[in-house]
């Protein structure tokens, strides 16, 4: 597993955006052979989306032949609700780039049959062969997407009950009222993520330090779903300095030396 230790959340956003642009451009996607990109929501990737928009407007990348799959969506929120992940993605990314609407894939949390919707989503991903790069974030408790602690490490896209900790954390988007946060969500599974050709996890802030430590220095453990990244042949974590506070100094120095050339690309 790779660890890219940077100074700030802003640097994490810039580095990850440039990495995505380089992957897309290197792939040379066409309508018949699109680049397939997995995407998250939440506060952490906002810097990345901002930088991607800037790079697109500067003419450095086109998303016309990029197909996206989002990680998750709340159950029961209308798509046009301000806190739905459909709204989040439209407002913070999709409406600012040249992606084709038919290439955007987000789970439908209002589908009449949620189990069938999850199977449809898995089948749609498989129809493209694989996701080439899945970008994600991580929760304070180590969850990826809505794969909460004790999730099966081979899980597929499914309905999940959100923990109280996750609902409290997300209540900041709902006026601080946890009761307004849905109790259920649809989410890609850990196994779904692991099927991607490459996974890039963004980690910023002191609150994520314990999760980063578990992912990098701990054992693979279903109580820390992020630790599954150790088993991926192309797993990478891009982190800022505050999030490394629980790592051993020698661990951080090791990756600083190992990735010096890549860090220097900023």
Swiss-Prot record:
<dbReference type="GO" id="GO:0005975">
    <property type="term" value="P:carbohydrate metabolic process"/>
</dbReference>
<dbReference type="InterPro" id="IPR004547">
    <property type="entry name" value="Glucosamine6P_isomerase"/>
</dbReference>
<comment type="function">
    <text>Catalyzes the reversible isomerization-deamination of glucosamine 6-phosphate (GlcN6P) to form fructose 6-phosphate (Fru6P) and ammonium ion.</text>
</comment>
<feature type="site" description="Part of the allosteric site">
    <location>
        <position position="161"/>
    </location>
</feature>
<comment type="subunit">
    <text>Homohexamer.</text>
</comment>
<feature type="active site" description="For ring-opening step">
    <location>
        <position position="148"/>
    </location>
</feature>
<dbReference type="InterPro" id="IPR018321">
    <property type="entry name" value="Glucosamine6P_isomerase_CS"/>
</dbReference>
<dbReference type="GO" id="GO:0006046">
    <property type="term" value="P:N-acetylglucosamine catabolic process"/>
</dbReference>
<feature type="site" description="Part of the allosteric site">
    <location>
        <position position="158"/>
    </location>
</feature>
<dbReference type="GO" id="GO:0004342">
    <property type="term" value="F:glucosamine-6-phosphate deaminase activity"/>
</dbReference>
<feature type="active site" description="For ring-opening step">
    <location>
        <position position="141"/>
    </location>
</feature>
<dbReference type="GO" id="GO:0042802">
    <property type="term" value="F:identical protein binding"/>
</dbReference>
<feature type="active site" description="Proton acceptor; for enolization step">
    <location>
        <position position="72"/>
    </location>
</feature>
<keyword id="KW-0021">Allosteric enzyme</keyword>
<comment type="pathway">
    <text>Amino-sugar metabolism; N-acetylneuraminate degradation; D-fructose 6-phosphate from N-acetylneuraminate: step 5/5.</text>
</comment>
<dbReference type="Pfam" id="PF01182">
    <property type="entry name" value="Glucosamine_iso"/>
</dbReference>
<keyword id="KW-0378">Hydrolase</keyword>
<feature type="site" description="Part of the allosteric site">
    <location>
        <position position="160"/>
    </location>
</feature>
<dbReference type="InterPro" id="IPR037171">
    <property type="entry name" value="NagB/RpiA_transferase-like"/>
</dbReference>
<dbReference type="InterPro" id="IPR006148">
    <property type="entry name" value="Glc/Gal-6P_isomerase"/>
</dbReference>
<dbReference type="GO" id="GO:0019262">
    <property type="term" value="P:N-acetylneuraminate catabolic process"/>
</dbReference>
<protein>
    <recommendedName>
        <fullName>Glucosamine-6-phosphate deaminase</fullName>
        <ecNumber>3.5.99.6</ecNumber>
    </recommendedName>
</protein>
<feature type="site" description="Part of the allosteric site">
    <location>
        <position position="151"/>
    </location>
</feature>
<dbReference type="GO" id="GO:0006043">
    <property type="term" value="P:glucosamine catabolic process"/>
</dbReference>
<feature type="active site" description="Proton acceptor; for ring-opening step">
    <location>
        <position position="143"/>
    </location>
</feature>
<comment type="similarity">
    <text>Belongs to the glucosamine/galactosamine-6-phosphate isomerase family. NagB subfamily.</text>
</comment>
<dbReference type="GO" id="GO:0005737">
    <property type="term" value="C:cytoplasm"/>
</dbReference>
<keyword id="KW-0119">Carbohydrate metabolism</keyword>
<feature type="site" description="Part of the allosteric site">
    <location>
        <position position="254"/>
    </location>
</feature>
